[in-house]
């Protein structure tokens, strides 16, 4: 383990990268609060940021606009920093239906959710890493601005164990129970412990492949060992170990009982208000629901929907922002906002949507007013908590440019020598027939084509029309979930089909070097989908191919089109000059087609397993392709496989158990995106 970032890469910075890295680092070390990295597609933005992290040596949080891009970034940073703590923090819900009330139909919708236990483990690992290591880099989504347990409580509850320390076994068991660990003598699963004489085995909640064995002798800790919970194989011996709570929302018994008292006071005040307004049904409903929750909290320390009482549990004042992942960041950390033109507006939108739903619940007696404080951060609260930041985008928005106050670092020259796609304008009247002839030309070359339309109806009709004319085409629409979207893009790259039609789903996203043509239909219809930024982003999808071309079908030149074409021409000229000066011949990007998380998860498993795990453990045979499975199917399959794995381990059939573990690892990988 090291406390310094160690960048591992087979190549050195080139093109605009050295100057960009130097400028970003100099600005950061000079204390500049905000700066922008304007990087075109294929210019090596992630590699540039990795070099900045290596030089500034600060804990880093990277925010991405969605799980797909977060997964890709996680894999890339994991390969750049294999010896450091690279973590993944996204929403752990495979499915989430928040509780809501529809007054017009008098319909109450109960909260319903499905939690991905593997992502929950990665979230716990991320917060533990931020609190315990300086060489931590966390890739997160907007989930980072939602409420977590307070870091003070999280730290105060932790159990620190050292060789030679005197500790009573009953006290140790009680402390583990306070951390919400469960005792299970039959099966050692994540978040559980077992007792065998003076030996305690604990499977830490944030660990995926390692468990802790605590050996006591006459009340002293004689030995601390990390071992494989499946085979019992010893991985390494330790002098010291810290066990963190099983959940971010763990709190002390005293704090819970204190919260029960303050909730009772709030309930009394709220009932008086409702009775004074003659809202008898609402008052009765609120009293009944809250009393039930209070009884559960007093008896077992937990209740369904306990997050709605988070203000009382954290001791915050009304209106105060909840603790979030940003509270776990040290003050000198670095924040990187990837695709900032999308991520920044997302952050501002989260609070408003959440507030509207909860106000209805409070008004009609389903929740106490304090439930309004279980919320994401407001935009201004997020700004106040953000450390020194770098906004990264090919098309920075007005907010980023304003906040950076002119400190914009350009990353326009690509080390590969690739030039921005040629942009052509063609008339709308013949756009479909012209597009078909272009598609046939690209198919002959073995390339792929992206087509973006303005409406869902047009996308459906175009997909049907192209299909009728023998073209292998798919339509990427908003109803497709993240995992399936990744699968479709992968199939496009593999050549299972040649043309992908979409509306607003092809702008920011995964790298597709096989795409040599981007067609933008009705490019002269001004609006969000045809703004300057959207056009530049869409054109950029063809920027990784030597034959890259973008066709804008339009009957008139709009300001957005002109600005996008001018910017594209400027970038082309700069790249051509660089190529001539350095004698570079452009080449298409060669990027292996694989699962976006595959390499990262393998690296993580190897790192967490330690050197004690022999190579012969990787004995899994070919397993089914799980990537297209729905979250509910994945959860069910995981439970079934885990039961089989533990049964094999009980029967001492460790090789069979290891095979199933490898299947489980592939299944978890498929669920991450």
Swiss-Prot record:
The residue ranges flagged as biased composition, category Basic and acidic residues, are 618-630
Which stretches make up the Helicase ATP-binding domain?
26-183
Keywords, alphabetical: ATP-binding, Cytoplasm, DNA damage, DNA excision, DNA repair, Excision nuclease, Helicase, Hydrolase, Nucleotide-binding, SOS response
The family database entries (InterPro entries) matched by this protein are listed as: Helicase/UvrB_N, Helicase_ATP-bd, Helicase_C-like, P-loop_NTPase, UVR_dom, UVR_dom_sf, UvrB, UvrB_inter
Domain Helicase C-terminal: residue ranges: 431-597
Question: Known CDD domains for this protein?
Answer: DEXHc_UvrB, SF2_C_UvrB
Q: Which domain of life is it from?
A: Bacteria
Q: For this UniProt entry, what is the primary localization, expressed as one broad class?
A: cytoplasm
Q: Where does ATP bind?
A: 39-46
Ranges where the UVR domain occurs = 635-670
- Gene Ontology terms: cellular component: cytoplasm; excinuclease repair complex
Q: Which Gene Ontology BP annotations are present?
A: nucleotide-excision repair; SOS response
Q: A single Pfam family, by name?
A: UVR
Q: Where is this region: Disordered?
A: 601-631
Q: Where is this motif: Beta-hairpin?
A: 92-115
Q: Where would you find this protein in the cell?
A: Cytoplasm
* GO MF entries: ATP binding; ATP hydrolysis activity; DNA binding; excinuclease ABC activity; helicase activity
The record's comment about this protein's domains reads: The beta-hairpin motif is involved in DNA binding.
Q: What does this protein do?
A: The UvrABC repair system catalyzes the recognition and processing of DNA lesions. A damage recognition complex composed of 2 UvrA and 2 UvrB subunits scans DNA for abnormalities. Upon binding of the UvrA(2)B(2) complex to a putative damaged site, the DNA wraps around one UvrB monomer. DNA wrap is dependent on ATP binding by UvrB and probably causes local melting of the DNA helix, facilitating insertion of UvrB beta-hairpin between the DNA strands. Then UvrB probes one DNA strand for the presence of a lesion.
HAMAP family recorded: UvrB
Q: How does it assemble?
A: Forms a heterotetramer with UvrA during the search for lesions. Interacts with UvrC in an incision complex.
Q: Which family does it belong to?
A: Belongs to the UvrB family.
State the name under which the record lists this protein: UvrABC system protein B
- Gene that produces this protein: uvrB
């Amino acid at each position: 383990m090291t406390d310094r970032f160690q960048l591992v890469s087979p190549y050195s910075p080139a093109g605009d990268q050295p100057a960009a890295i130097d400028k970003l680092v100099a600005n950061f070390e000079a204390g500049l609060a905000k700066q922008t990295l304007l990087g075109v597609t294929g210019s090596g933005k992630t590699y540039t940021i990795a070099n900045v992290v290596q030089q500034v040596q600060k804990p880093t949080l990277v925010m991405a606009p969605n799980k797909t891009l977060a997964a890709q970034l996680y894999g890339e940073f994991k390969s750049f920093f294999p010896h450091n703590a690279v973590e993944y923090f996204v929403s752990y819900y495979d499915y989430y239906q928040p509780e809501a009330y529809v007054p017009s139909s008098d319909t109450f919708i109960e909260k319903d959710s499905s939690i991905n236990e593997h992502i929950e483990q990665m979230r716990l690992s991320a917060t533990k890493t931020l609190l315990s290591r300086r060489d931590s880099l966390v890739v997160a989504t907007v989930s980072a601005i939602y409420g977590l347990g307070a870091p003070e409580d999280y730290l105060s509850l932790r159990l620190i164990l050292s060789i030679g320390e005197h500790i009573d076994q009953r006290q140790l068991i009680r402390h583990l129970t306070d951390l919400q660990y469960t005792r299970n003598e039959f099966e050692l699963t994540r978040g559980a412990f077992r007792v065998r004489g003076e030996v305690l085995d604990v499977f830490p909640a944030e660990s995926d492949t390692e468990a802790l064995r605590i050996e006591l002798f006459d009340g002293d800790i004689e030995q601390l060992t990390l071992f494989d919970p499946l085979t019992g194989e010893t991985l390494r011996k330790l002098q010291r170990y810290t066990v963190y709570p099983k959940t971010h929302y763990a709190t002390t018994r005293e704090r819970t009982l204190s919260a029960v008292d303050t909730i009772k006071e709030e309930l009394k005040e709220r009932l008086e208000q409702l009775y004074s307004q003659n809202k008898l049904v609402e008052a009765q409903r609120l009293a009944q629901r809250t009393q039930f929750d209070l009884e559960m909290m007093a008896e077992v320390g937990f209740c369904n929907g306990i997050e709605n009482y988070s203000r009382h549990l954290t001791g915050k004042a009304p209106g105060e922002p909840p603790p979030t992942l940003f509270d776990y960041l040290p003050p000198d950390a670095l924040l990187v906002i990837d695709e900032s033109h999308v991520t920044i507006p997302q952050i501002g939108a989260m609070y408003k949507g959440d507030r509207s739903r909860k106000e209805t619940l409070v008004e009609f007696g389903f929740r106490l007013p304090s439930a309004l404080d279980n919320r994401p951060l407001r935009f201004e609260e997020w700004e106040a908590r953000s450390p020194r930041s770098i906004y990264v985008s090919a098309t920075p928005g007005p907010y980023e440019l304003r906040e950076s106050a002119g400190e914009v670092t350009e990353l326009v020259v690509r080390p590969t020598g690739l030039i921005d796609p040629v942009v052509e304008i063609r008339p709308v009247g013949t756009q479909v027939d012209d597009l078909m002839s272009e598609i046939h030309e690209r198919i002959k070359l073995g390339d792929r084509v992206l087509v973006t339309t303005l409406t869902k109806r047009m996308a459906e009709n175009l997909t049907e029309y192209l299909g009728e004319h023998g073209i292998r085409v798919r339509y990427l629409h908003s109803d497709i979930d993240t995992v399936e979207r990744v699968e479709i893009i992968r199939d496009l790259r593999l050549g299972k089909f040649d043309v992908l039609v979409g509306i607003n789903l092809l702008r920011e996203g995964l790298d597709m070097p096989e795409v040599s043509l981007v067609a933008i239909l009705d490019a002269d219809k001004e609006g969000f989908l045809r703004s300057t930024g959207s056009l530049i982003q869409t054109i950029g999808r063809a920027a990784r191919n030597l034959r890259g071309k973008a066709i804008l079908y339009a009957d008139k030149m709009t300001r957005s089109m002109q600005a996008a074409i001018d910017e594209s021409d400027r970038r082309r000229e700069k790249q051509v000059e660089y190529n001539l000066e350095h004698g570079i011949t452009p080449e298409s990007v060669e990027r292996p087609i694989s699962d976006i998380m595959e390499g990262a998860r393998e690296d993580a498993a190897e790192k967490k397993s330690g050197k004690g795990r022999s190579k012969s453990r990787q004995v899994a045979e070919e397993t089914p392709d799980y990537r297209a499975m729905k979250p509910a199917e994945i959860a069910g399959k995981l439970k079934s496989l885990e039961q089989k794995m533990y049964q094999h381990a009980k029967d001492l059939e460790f090789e069979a158990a290891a095979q199933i573990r490898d299947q489980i690892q592939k299944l978890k990988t498929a669920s991450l995106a």
